[in-house]
Amino acid sequence: MEFKLLLVLCFNIGLICSQKTKPIGSKPIAVTTAAKTPATSTSPVTNGTGGPKFDLAALQKLLATFQMMQGAQGGNTAPSSSLPGVSSMPMPSANQISRKSNINANSLYQPELMNTNVPYMGNSLQQSRFQNQFLGGQFAPNVNVYRTNNHISSFEQMRLTRSYNLDEEQKFKILEEHNKFRSDVVQKRGTGAMNVLRWSEKLAAQASLEVMNCSYVNQGRGASLASVYEKYTGSSLVSEFMSRWSDEKNRFSLGENCSIQQTCRYSQAVWANTKQVGCAVQYCGDMSFIACSYSPVGNTVNQIAFSPSRGGICSACTTPPNMPVRCNSDHLCEWY
């Protein structure tokens, strides 16, 4: 239903006037104005000649309503006003809202809390997207659940600058693929303490030492290596080497030595206690060498990558004293 509301401020007589037109196929919408109600917290305004007074607060309220109506009809920005106390109201459309919007003072993503301190059952919006992925259909009790965007933590850095031959898109792709691995483990194998991975530039610098000499030899710094033909670039480069690590999943056996099974790259990618990753690329002739370093490092002798749990999603996340347990919509622990 379309309608148009035109507000006119008649300064010469000091009244609030309204002009309206009929919505198509409907009755006219009644508009109430209060022309002579004394304004609160502001001095009464006259027309300068002792004429009738009008209520500035009422005008501001009506103008705000008009701006909201304009935004609902598809406008991205409501018209601004020259009146004191009435500012423009930006109304971004859905396709203008990106992963990097709504940042806080610390230049992090503004976390979007999906629920607080109740077992998560899903509302109509999330249910269709997430319910079939739930292990048992419920998060653990007393868990704060935050929404992720493309498997990126709600608390990830706002910007990831280009370094070590990786641009921002590739870095976010690396995080996305790693967290997909980890979320898949929670859903299919069951663990209540799988941390979400975030980017570390310090680890990226460490990883660069593994590939700087164009050598496919692990230097013992806890890095995972891969070599990819140079025809792969951009996000396809990341997808290619991550798919090779994913192939190790078919041979992975929880509790077995990863070096024997030749699954150490996948095992490290899903090591539950790991919190950060940083990667680097070195171009060497017709090959690209990639290394990723992790912290805390995984593949520890006599330890397993993750522990199955029946306590619910995020039931065993480690949390500082007196702080709430944080989880996300990918079923990964949001660490502090």
Curated annotation (Swiss-Prot):
InterPro entries: CAP_dom, CAP_sf, CRISP-related. Glycans are attached at N47, N213, N257. Its main location: secreted. Keywords: Glycoprotein, Secreted, Signal. Residues 175-292 form the SCP domain. It is found in: Secreted. Component of the acid-insoluble and acid-soluble organic matrix of calcified layers of the shell (at protein level). Residues 1-18 form the signal peptide. Pfam families: CAP. Residues 73-85 have a biased composition (Polar residues). Residues 73-94 are annotated as: Disordered. One of its GO terms (cellular component) is extracellular region. This is SCP domain-containing protein 1.
